[in-house]
């Protein structure tokens, strides 16, 4: 008796995983009331690409504690916050911190997708992307669009 490889079952599982992905509009249902300025669908995709490139160069800060520590030290970059994080008290002080330090920040709809963009299986509620010459063009485009978003009052 030999083992039979389960290749057909794996491909079925992958197909099911693809069907479980939620659309941008479905993700908007779970947003917090403080999730402003919110990135558009196109900007969200650009940010994910920039984050993936930054991870390869190890130019990101991940998590509330680490991001807050380096913002207070004066590090510059784009702060990307997940709009579906609960309770909001976990990270509601970060936009104020960004405004004090003149850092651009933007909300995206899903913490799960934000974590996946970093190559992690865990959801992540905040990431700071630092500039680097390897992906400077992508970073500059994202920075320009994030700064063009209207800031909340």
UniProtKB/Swiss-Prot annotation:
Position(s), cross-link Glycyl lysine isopeptide (Lys-Gly) (interchain with G-Cter in SUMO1): 5
Cross-link type Glycyl lysine isopeptide (Lys-Gly) (interchain with G-Cter in SUMO), residue numbers: 5
Major subcellular site: nucleus
PTM sites of type Phosphoserine: 19
GO terms for MF: box H/ACA snoRNA binding; mRNA 3'-UTR binding; telomerase RNA binding; U3 snoRNA binding
Keyword RNA-binding annotated: yes
Domain of life: Eukaryota
Entry's Gene Ontology cellular component terms: box H/ACA snoRNP complex; box H/ACA telomerase RNP complex; Cajal body; sno(s)RNA-containing ribonucleoprotein complex; telomerase holoenzyme complex
Covalent link Glycyl lysine isopeptide (Lys-Gly) (interchain with G-Cter in SUMO2), residues: 3, 5
Subunit structure: Part of the H/ACA small nucleolar ribonucleoprotein (H/ACA snoRNP) complex, which contains NHP2/NOLA2, GAR1/NOLA1, NOP10/NOLA3, and DKC1/NOLA4, which is presumed to be the catalytic subunit. The complex contains a stable core formed by binding of one or two NOP10-DKC1 heterodimers to NHP2; GAR1 subsequently binds to this core via DKC1. The complex binds a box H/ACA small nucleolar RNA (snoRNA), which may target the specific site of modification within the RNA substrate. During assembly, the complex contains NAF1 instead of GAR1/NOLA1.
Function as written in the Swiss-Prot or TrEMBL entry: Required for ribosome biogenesis and telomere maintenance. Part of the H/ACA small nucleolar ribonucleoprotein (H/ACA snoRNP) complex, which catalyzes pseudouridylation of rRNA. This involves the isomerization of uridine such that the ribose is subsequently attached to C5, instead of the normal N1. Each rRNA can contain up to 100 pseudouridine ('psi') residues, which may serve to stabilize the conformation of rRNAs. May also be required for correct processing or intranuclear trafficking of TERC, the RNA component of the telomerase reverse transcriptase (TERT) holoenzyme.
Protein name: H/ACA ribonucleoprotein complex subunit 2
Annotated source species: Mus musculus
Lineage, highest ranks first: Eukaryota, Metazoa, Chordata, Craniata, Vertebrata
């Amino acid at each position: 008796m030999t083992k039979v490889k389960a290749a057909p079952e794996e491909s079925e599982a992958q197909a099911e995983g693809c069907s479980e992905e939620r659309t941008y509009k479905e993700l908007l249902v779970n947003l917090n009331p403080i999730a402003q300025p919110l990135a558009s669908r196109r900007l969200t995709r650009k940010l994910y690409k920039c984050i993936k490139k930054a991870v390869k160069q190890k130019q990101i800060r991940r998590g509330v504690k680490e991001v807050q520590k380096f913002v207070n030290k004066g590090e510059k970059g784009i702060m990307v916050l997940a709009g579906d994080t609960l309770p909001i008290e976990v990270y509601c002080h970060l936009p104020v911190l960004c405004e004090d330090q003149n850092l651009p920040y933007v909300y995206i709809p899903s913490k799960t997708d934000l974590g996946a963009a970093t190559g992690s299986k865990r959801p992540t509620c905040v990431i700071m992307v630092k500039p680097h010459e390897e992906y400077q063009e992508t970073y500059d485009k994202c920075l320009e669009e994030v700064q063009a978003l209207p800031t909340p009052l």
